[in-house]
């Protein structure tokens, strides 16, 4: 009989062993190799004593996966999922099961990274290109981005673009029609305040009365009215104003496109194309503009180029606009967007096709027609006389109607002026309309849905004016017209998935990206309807489960970070930076020090830091780093003193972007505080802090947390993300507010930074599960294992490559940088060559040329096993041997496995391959491990220059499919 106790047999800590890659025997072998007795010994060697936490986290003990699911189920059950007719940018939708199972719930799609290595990302690049094509077709404009965070932040980006491209250079007014969604107005006002723009909100027709650089309109508007803006847009453009339009994606299937009315920019949420409401997100925003504004477009763009064989290949285009290159001069700070959700929306369009989408749109419109006709027949006053899906109206006894709605588990839109609204959706049925009649009119109204439908068919409907009915064809490309059976759709999705390398194939060791395990159990609650089908503006007593989950998660994160409060609204890391800087800005203003507008940023900082500071209206002063990669304290002190009167803050990452725990971090905080500034500690590297130290204990005032890095939300191929901010008590009154949902914690004048009050709320259960399952023991062990894995890889590779920076005791933190510049000088082999050659070995390349050009930054995370680390090390050592052959002249510098990487099936089938100085086996099966688990890149190295010089960001011409 076993002598283990029942507690031991219950295995409450089993998930810790599931999450952490190396088992205890492997851990000891690795510790022996790096020269440490234990994980605690290694921790003490690496983490400066002055900042060690010295206590257990107050997040509870680890628990089993079934126990964790049972716990979160209690929260889900407290959410009351009413039928929602609120609309306002969030609608019921049906996620096709083939997409839910094969994309949304498939690690081949949700664990991939942003496609910076396009040769191993052709599948999701095609899906995103489809999203761009969909966006362009529906809006009637030329060039679309790969997705933005949500409709409201897209509106803020549209305003910024308008200012950049408007020829009305002296104008400083941006006009917003007063029937734009209130959350959008809120977010735009927040951004405008930072830029110093004047916002005027008024009736759309009054826009021509102002000298503007841009204007924003909603199509269809908050009340459901459809307006032909053609003449107004022309009048505004005559005055050199840039016209931007927030549009409903489903309505555009049926309505005249804003582009054909003359709009310059069109954006909106793609949520109702098969993505659940999720209490606010995540959802992809589309953003489309004219070709002449392409250099000013925010976010990523997928473009068509060619590979070295001249074959069509996809890549991210015009990256010189983006924050990781242009920093404070970038068009936007956006980095992570909403790629997974954009892919879902594009697959939704592919699966239904233009005819299927038209049927869905027509059904939604017919239900709105029936509802409106019934109300009019009973003498109800309608607010709008045109509509696609939304009918607004007034009733004599609004309170009684609202009471009947709640009793029937129905949510109507209730405006402050007493107007009620009903927005039909894909999920709405004829039975729902009958119930709505009962709610609005009371019993005994005598209306019959079928009879009204027959009358509409017989007599027609003028709710969409004839001149606003879409006449042009949409989605004519073969991709949108051939995958309408589930068999074909399933195979199309799988065919694209097979082109991409994600975590379900091999380690992705991207430094500063923390590509750790996204456990299946953590992901499961995201699919539950109790979380997915909640409208973000529903009465708060219906979202009690969300409220309690968010409160508990906030308390855990407060304890982990050492801060006093959390704000969950930012829906990306870059959005979190912006929100944190706004809190600092408002704090200074509250003290009569609004002139403090200088942000110090070390030269090693992430590109989002200066881009976010610029968005927040700050002036950037760069501080130097010393030869060891640390912040140069003398330079910092000198510059802090120089700008002391205007010093707002410093943005600093910890551990540093160079992968070490800087000994002077607390001193950095003290210097800034002495000069009246605040400390923004970038949370990108929190995976080396959790349970060992914390931003609050170090001395920082505010941080964002990348929940899609440290806290297990998957990267989704480029989003979704979540970037909540933690703040000290003095900054808590200045975090983001919301125009629609009041939390009661922040000041009334705090603007929103995202469309929804809790950002992408439906993915917060992933982080809740991560912390719940690991507990305080597992969180600390995970951080320690991240350190061990990084130091193991560093020491193994240091015999073959120079390691650029180390900290105390020649250790690194959770990532290391290898310096390829000496090898490049000696052999001509570039960091790009090595990155592409790793594709042949079945690996995604580490982070390339950041934070130092000519380097690779490697972050293995705690989730990778010793076997996988050894396979990666074997690949890197083998590549070093290949470089040696180039150095020795055995292989020509312009014809070797590195220069020609990656290799495809077409290469080894090519009869001319024999002219190469290396074998086919060397090209594609360089090690036994590769033979056992081969990943095939589907294109050769892509020509970036060709792609930017011949910009094409739409699906291939139809002739390519013949």
From Swiss-Prot:
It catalyses: N(6)-[(R)-lipoyl]-L-lysyl-[glycine-cleavage complex H protein] + glycine + H(+) = N(6)-[(R)-S(8)-aminomethyldihydrolipoyl]-L-lysyl-[glycine-cleavage complex H protein] + CO2. It comes from the Bacteria. GO terms for biological process: glycine decarboxylation via glycine cleavage system. Keywords: Oxidoreductase, Pyridoxal phosphate. Disulfide bonds: none annotated. Its cofactor is pyridoxal 5'-phosphate. GO terms for cellular component: cytosol; glycine cleavage complex. It is an enzyme of class 1 (oxidoreductase). The modification N6-(pyridoxal phosphate)lysine is found at residue 709. InterPro entries: GcvP (IPR003437), GDC-P_C (IPR049316), GDC-P_N (IPR049315), GDC_P (IPR020581), PyrdxlP-dep_Trfase (IPR015424), PyrdxlP-dep_Trfase_major (IPR015421), PyrdxlP-dep_Trfase_small (IPR015422). GO terms for molecular function: glycine binding; glycine dehydrogenase (decarboxylating) activity; pyridoxal phosphate binding. Gene3D superfamilies: Aspartate Aminotransferase, domain 1, Type I PLP-dependent aspartate aminotransferase-like (Major domain). CDD domains: GDC-P. Its EC number is 1.4.4.2. HAMAP family: GcvP. The glycine cleavage system is composed of four proteins: P, T, L and H. The glycine cleavage system catalyzes the degradation of glycine. The P protein binds the alpha-amino group of glycine through its pyridoxal phosphate cofactor; CO(2) is released and the remaining methylamine moiety is then transferred to the lipoamide cofactor of the H protein. Belongs to the GcvP family. This is Glycine dehydrogenase (decarboxylating).
């Amino acid at each position: 009989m076993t002598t283990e106790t029942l507690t031991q047999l219950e295995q409450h800590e089993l998930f810790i062993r599931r999450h952490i890659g190396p088992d205890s025997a492997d851990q000891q072998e690795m510790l022996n190799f790096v020269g440490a007795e234990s994980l605690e010994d290694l921790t003490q060697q690496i983490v400066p004593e002055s900042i060690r936490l010295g206590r257990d986290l107050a997040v509870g003990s680890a628990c089993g996966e079934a126990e964790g699911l049972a716990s979160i189920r209690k929260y889900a059950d407290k959410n009351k999922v009413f039928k929602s007719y609120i609309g306002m940018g969030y609608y019921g939708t049906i996620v096709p099961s083939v997409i839910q199972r094969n994309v949304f719930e498939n690690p081949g799609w949700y664990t991939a990274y942003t496609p910076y290595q396009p040769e191993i990302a052709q599948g999701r690049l095609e899906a995103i290109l489809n999203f761009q094509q969909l966006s362009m077709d529906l809006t009637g404009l030329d060039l679309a981005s790969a997705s933005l965070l949500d409709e409201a932040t897209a509106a803020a980006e549209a305003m910024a673009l308008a200012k950049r491209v408007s020829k009305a250079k002296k104008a400083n007014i941006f006009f917003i029609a007063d029937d734009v969604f209130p959350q959008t107005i809120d977010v735009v006002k927040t951004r405008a305040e930072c830029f110093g723009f004047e916002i005027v909100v008024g009736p759309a027709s009054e826009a021509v009365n102002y000298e503007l650089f841009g204007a924003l309109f909603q199509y269809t508007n908050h009340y459901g009215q459809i307006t032909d803006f053609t003449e107004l847009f022309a009048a505004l453009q005559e005055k050199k104003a840039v016209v931007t339009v927030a549009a409903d994606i489903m309505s555009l299937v049926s309505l005249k496109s804003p582009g054909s009315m003359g709009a310059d920019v069109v954006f909106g949420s793609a949520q109702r194309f098969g993505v659940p409401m999720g209490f606010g997100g995540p959802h992809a925003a589309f953003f489309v503009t004219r070709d002449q504004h392409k250099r000013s477009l925010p976010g990523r763009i997928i473009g068509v180029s060619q590979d070295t064989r001249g074959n069509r290949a996809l890549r991210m285009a015009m990256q010189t606009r983006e924050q990781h290159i242009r920093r404070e001069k970038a068009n936007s700070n956006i980095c992570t967007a909403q790629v997974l959700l954009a892919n879902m929306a594009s697959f939704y369009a592919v699966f239904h096709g233009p005819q299927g989408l038209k049927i869905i749109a027509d059904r939604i419109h017919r239900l709105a027609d029936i509802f409106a006709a019934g109300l009019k027949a009973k003498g109800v006053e309608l607010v709008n006389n045109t509509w696609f899906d939304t009918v607004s109206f007034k009733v004599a006894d609004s309170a009684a109607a609202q009471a009947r709605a709640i009793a029937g588990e129905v949510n109507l839109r209730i405006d402050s002026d007493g107007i009620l609204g009903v927005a039909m959706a894909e999920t709405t049925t004829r039975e729902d309309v009958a119930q709505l009649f009962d709610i609005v009119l009371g019993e005994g109204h005598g209306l019959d849905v079928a009879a009204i439908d027959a009358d509409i068919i017989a007599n027609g409907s003028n709710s969409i004016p004839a001149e606003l009915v879409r006449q042009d064809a949409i989605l004519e490309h073969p991709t949108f017209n051939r995958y309408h059976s589930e068999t074909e759709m399933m195979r199309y999705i799988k065919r694209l998935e097979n082109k991409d390398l994600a975590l379900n194939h091999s380690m992705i060791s991207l430094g500063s990206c923390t590509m750790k395990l996204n456990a299946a159990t953590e992901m499961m609650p995201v699919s539950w309807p109790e979380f997915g089908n909640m409208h973000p503006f529903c009465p708060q007593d219906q979202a009690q489960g969300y409220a309690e989950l968010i409160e508990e998660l906030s308390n855990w994160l407060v304890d982990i970070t050492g801060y006093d409060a959390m704000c969950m609204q930012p829906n990306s890391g870059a959005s979190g930076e912006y929100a944190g800087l706004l809190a600092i800005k408002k704090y200074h203003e509250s003290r009569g020090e609004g002139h403090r507008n200088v942000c110090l940023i070390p030269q090693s900082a992430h590109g989002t830091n200066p881009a976010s500071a610029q968005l927040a209206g700050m002036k950037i002063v760069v501080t130097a780093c010393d030869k060891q990669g640390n912040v140069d304290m003398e330079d910092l002190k000198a510059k802090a003193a120089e700008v002391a009167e205007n010093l707002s803050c410093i943005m600093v990452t910890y551990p540093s972007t160079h992968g070490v725990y800087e000994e002077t971090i607390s001193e950095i905080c003290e210097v800034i505080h002495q000069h009246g500034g605040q400390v923004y500690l970038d949370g990108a590297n929190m995976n080396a802090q959790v349970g060992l130290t914390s931003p609050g204990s170090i001395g920082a005032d505010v941080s964002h947390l990348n929940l899609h890095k440290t806290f297990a939300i998957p990267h989704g191929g480029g989003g979704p993300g979540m970037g909540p901010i933690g703040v000290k008590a003095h900054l808590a009154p200045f975090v983001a507010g919301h125009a629609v949902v009041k939390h009661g914690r922040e000041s009334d004048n705090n603007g929103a930074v995202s469309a929804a009050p809790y950002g992408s709320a439906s993915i917060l259960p992933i982080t809740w599960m991560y912390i719940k399952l690991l507990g305080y023991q597992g969180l600390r062990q995970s951080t320690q294992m991240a350190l061990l894995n990084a130091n193991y890889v560093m020491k193994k590779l240091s015999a073959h490559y120079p390691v650029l920076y180390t900290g105390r005791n020649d250790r690194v933190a959770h990532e290391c940088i290898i310096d390829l510049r000496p090898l490049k000088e000696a052999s001509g082999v570039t960091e790009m060559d090595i990155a592409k050659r790793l594709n042949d070995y079945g690996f995604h390349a580490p982070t390339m040329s950041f934070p130092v050009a000519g380097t690779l930054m490697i972050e293995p995370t705690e989730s990778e096993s010793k076997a996988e680390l050894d396979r990666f090390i074997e690949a890197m050592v083998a590549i070093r041997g290949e470089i040696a052959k180039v150095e020795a002249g055995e292989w020509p510098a312009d014809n070797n496995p590195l220069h020609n990487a990656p290799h495809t099936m077409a290469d080894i089938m090519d009869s001319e391959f024999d002219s190469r100085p290396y074998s086919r086996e060397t090209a594609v099966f360089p090690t036994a491990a590769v033979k056992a688990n081969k990943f095939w890149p589907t294109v050769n190295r892509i020509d970036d220059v060709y792609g930017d010089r011949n910009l094409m960001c739409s699906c291939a011409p139809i002739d390519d499919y013949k």
